[in-house]
A protein has these predicted regions:
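Amphipathic alpha-helical repeat scaffolds
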Residues: 8, 94-102, 213-219
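RNA substrate-binding interface of SAM-dependent RNA methyltransferases
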Residues: 28, 80-166
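Short beta->alpha connector loops at strand-helix junctions that form conserved
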Residues: 55-56, 91, 117-118, 140, ...
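Short acidic-hydrophobic, aromatic-tinged amphipathic segments that line or gate anion-handling sites
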Residues: 6, 51-56, 139-149, 203
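Short, structured interface segments
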Residues: 69-79
Length: 229
């Protein structure tokens, strides 16, 4: 399928603001009661020449929750990473909720480039879009067949794989000020392969022995916060 959906007014508004050229149409349910949101959506559709339909049956057929009253229909698109900027790299991510949360966190702290090493979830899945609260549409992202392919295209940068066997605790890490970097995180279930210990400077987020690991979205958020503060 070459198109996808935004479910809800806020993600739909973010789509219209940031990627209007890819929007096919917007559907509104007659039960939508936020006049302010309707006016924003209507204004953006008019501004960009996007069809706006008030079609309750179409919304009800597409939505996965009864409290969804706005649906954006958009064509999937591709873009490229900025080699001079900092990147988040996710190796084989499999959870759509985590992906959306990571995107939202990354955009919130100013990292706007995401590399996904295949296989990985589709960033355009409506569950990812919703978990990102529409911040996906501010993101540069690219899928790569392998980490080696990513490195070939990423430009000169420092690499920081986050691993349980990381050599340096995050809170003790010494970095060059102003460096361009990539923060690398593994799959939710398996983490990064041991071979990533040889890629740049491996890092570990220390925690108590009462748990075996951190949730991927949480670990990524901690790493992003430490590197951007």
């Amino acid at each position: 399928m070459n198109h996808s959906y935004t479910f809800g007014a806020f993600p739909t508004i973010e789509l219209l603001k940031n990627q209007p050229e890819h929007v096919l149409k917007v559907l509104l349910h007659p039960d939508m009661n936020s006049q302010a949101q309707m006016e924003i959506i209507s204004g953006l559709c008019t501004q960009h020449g996007i069809p706006l339909e008030r079609n309750g049956k179409a919304v009800e057929k597409l939505r996965d929750k009864e409290n969804i009253f706005a649906v954006g229909v958009f064509e999937k698109y591709s873009n490229v990473l900025e080699p001079e900027k900092n990147h988040i790299v996710l190796v084989n991510p499999s959870d759509m909720g985590n992906m959306g949360t990571i995107i939202r966190t990354s955009i919130g702290f100013g990292i706007e480039n995401l590399a996904i090493i295949e296989p990985g979830v589709d960033v355009f899945n409506p569950k990812v879009v919703r978990a990102s609260m529409g911040s996906l549409f501010q993101l540069n992202f690219c899928y790569f067949k392998s980490f080696e392919e990513y490195k070939e295209q990423a430009g000169s940068r420092s690499l920081y794989p986050f691993m349980l066997k990381g050599a340096v605790p995050l809170q003790e890490l010494q970095r060059e000020k102003g460096e361009t970097y990539s923060l690398i995180f593994g799959n939710e279930a398996t983490g990064l392969p041991d071979s990533f210990a040889d890629e740049g400077q491996s890092v570990v987020i220390r925690h108590t022995d009462h748990i075996d690991s951190l949730n991927l979205a949480l670990a990524t958020g901690i790493g992003i916060y430490e590197f951007t503060r």
